[in-house]
Regions:
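Exposed beta-sheet edge/beta-hairpin loop segments within beta-rich domains
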Residues: 1, 85-86
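Long, contiguous amphipathic alpha-helices that act as assembly "spine/axial" helices in icosahedral shell
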Residues: 1-33, 93, 178-180
Length: 200
C-alpha cells in the first residue's frame, strides 16, 4: 500500500513537471524564449525577406472585446516569407483560469459585452474562434492570453524517451528507492501558429 502511494506521488510529480515545462514557451515568450529567427516568440518584428511579421499586439492589452478583435485582425494579416497573405485564422483561445469568466462572456454572449449598444457579438456570430477557449491552469500570468491559429507546424512537442519507472530494495536497510525518467522538449517551428498578448 505504501509503495503504491509513493509510485502515484512520483507519477504526479512527473506530470506536474511536464505541464510546467509545456507552458514555458508561452510564459516566457515575451522575454526570453526565442523562435527560430532569434527574436522572442511573441514579437512585432519577426524578420522575413519581405519585411516583418507580427504575432502580438502593438500595445499589450488585457483580454477584452477590442484586444481579441485586433488579435484576430492581426492574424488575418499574417504573411509568408515572401510577404504574401496566407489567410491565417484563429482557432482556439488559450487562457489562465483568471480569465475564464471574461472569455465565456466574450465567446458566448449573443450581444456585445460591457456596452449598452444593442449590437450583436461579432466574434460569436462570425465564428471567429471556432474551437472556443481552453483554460490552462499552469499559465502563471493572470493577464496573458493566446490564440492558436490554423497555420500548421506551430507549437511542437517531441517525446524523445517515454517515461520509464523502476524501483529497488536495499537489503541492509529495508528501504525502497523509486525513480522515473523521461525525455521531451517543447518548442515552436512556425511562430505564426500562435498569437499572444502579455496583458496590460
Amino acid at each position: 500500500r505504501l509503495a503504491s502511494r509513493y509510485t502515484k506521488a512520483l507519477a504526479r510529480s512527473m506530470a506536474q513537471t511536464k505541464q510546467t515545462k509545456a507552458v514555458t514557451p508561452l510564459v516566457n515568450g515575451f522575454t526570453t524564449f526565442q523562435s527560430g529567427d532569434s527574436t522572442v516568440l511573441f514579437s512585432r518584428s519577426h524578420p522575413t525577406i519581405a519585411g516583418n511579421v507580427a504575432n502580438t499586439l502593438a500595445t499589450q492589452a488585457d483580454l477584452n472585446e477590442t484586444s481579441l478583435e485586433q488579435s484576430l485582425i492581426d492574424i488575418a494579416e499574417m504573411t509568408d516569407e515572401r510577404g504574401l497573405l496566407i489567410a491565417a485564422k484563429g482557432l482556439k483561445l488559450v487562457i489562465p483560469s483568471a480569465l475564464q469568466f471574461t472569455a465565456e462572456r466574450l465567446m458566448a454572449s449573443q450581444g456585445r459585452t460591457a456596452t449598452a449598444d444593442n449590437d450583436i457579438n461579432a466574434i460569436r456570430s462570425m465564428g471567429m474562434v471556432p474551437q472556443g477557449y481552453r483554460v490552462n491552469n499552469f499559465l502563471t500570468d493572470p493577464d496573458q492570453f493566446f490564440i492558436i491559429t490554423d497555420v500548421p507546424n506551430g507549437m511542437k512537442y517531441f517525446d524523445r524517451s517515454p517515461i520509464k519507472t523502476a524501483m529497488e530494495g536495499d537489503f541492509d536497510t529495508g528501504n525502497v528507492r523509486y525513480k522515473a525518467r523521461e525525455r521531451y522538449v517543447f518548442g515552436v517551428s512556425d511562430y505564426r501558429g500562435i498569437y499572444g498578448s502579455n496583458g496590460a
